[in-house]
Amino acid sequence: MWPLWLCWALWVLPLAGPGAALTEEQLLGSLLRQLQLSEVPVLDRADMEKLVIPAHVRAQYVVLLRRSHGDRSRGKRFSQSFREVAGRFLASEASTHLLVFGMEQRLPPNSELVQAVLRLFQEPVPKAALHRHGRLSPRSAQARVTVEWLRVRDDGSNRTSLIDSRLVSVHESGWKAFDVTEAVNFWQQLSRPRQPLLLQVSVQREHLGPLASGAHKLVRFASQGAPAGLGEPQLELHTLDLRDYGAQGDCDPEAPMTEGTRCCRQEMYIDLQGMKWAKNWVLEPPGFLAYECVGTCQQPPEALAFNWPFLGPRQCIASETASLPMIVSIKEGGRTRPQVVSLPNMRVQKCSCASDGALVPRRLQP
């Protein structure tokens, strides 16, 4: 079964490519969708000359303008290097385990997480226990193992987030791997000092009903009982050093662009006053800096690409964007009035090197 996060829809910018320049057609299309229009409205010049933008409309526009400079939509970047963190069972019940990992200083500075893998050792089931359950069909001999990130809020309440889920067979034993990249991404968003990383692992029956098997109770994750620490839960952290594999920030306006230019953010001005369709329709702003992502990204070593074959070549993309507030004129019932709208993901705030297929993390909710 593929990890859950591979099935999630990736966040897509309204750009032709990951870091491509915003076009006039894309800007117009976004504005029409926001206003739920099929075509550009026809507005009389005489009506526009009489139109006055009320103070409350302009105030709303200013508020959105300020907010757009603070709120950003985030994409996700890529990384390399390997680090292993040993964890421990904080609490265990028949079908639920609470794991704790001390994470402070485990992620190198100026690095980015590619993948975090939780490894748990599944103990072999004694033959006598299997015999008591009778002959199990392949379906009834499976259990669903679910991993959730557990966050303890400041008020003492708990919040869980689903991270990964997969089927395991009661007939198998050994190390099982779960993708917990998103849990570490959530943990990184916590304010300092951060609490340890808490992962809740639950084992449940896959099929419900009167004929469902109770074989899921046979699945246990614990120490092998071999040398000390051999069966402890392990958290593998794979990162890349952004000094080598990241973007460089804003482009140097003095330096010419070449094939070897490192990924950077380049200024690009969108002149709304020069667009025919915007005349008499878009009142504010007259234009804006949209920026675009240009340049190339260093590719990871072949060994890393082999470990994650689902990741494509790394590209220079817009990893953080901001909305664009506008004041437009709307005609309703023979009257023309101004209206404030906000177009999402119109201005590039940050460029990064990312691999096609890489995880796009969710924002941590309060």
From Swiss-Prot:
Medical condition linked: Left-right axis malformations: The defect includes left pulmonary isomerism, with cardiac anomalies characterized by complete atrioventricular canal defect and hypoplastic left ventricle, and interrupted inferior vena cava.
Keyword annotations from UniProtKB, A to Z: Cytokine, Developmental protein, Disease variant, Disulfide bond, Glycoprotein, Growth factor, Heterotaxy, Secreted, Signal
Disulfide feature: C251-C264, C263-C316, C293-C351, C297-C353
Protein name in UniProt: Left-right determination factor 2
GO cellular component terms listed in the entry, alphabetical order: collagen-containing extracellular matrix; extracellular region; extracellular space; platelet alpha granule lumen
Native source organism of the sequence: Homo sapiens
PANTHER family linked: LEFT-RIGHT DETERMINATION FACTOR 2, TGF-BETA FAMILY
GO process annotations (BP): anterior/posterior axis specification
Signal peptide interval: 1-21
Expressed in which tissues: Mesenchymal cells of the endometrial stroma.
Function, in words: Required for left-right (L-R) asymmetry determination of organ systems in mammals. May play a role in endometrial bleeding.
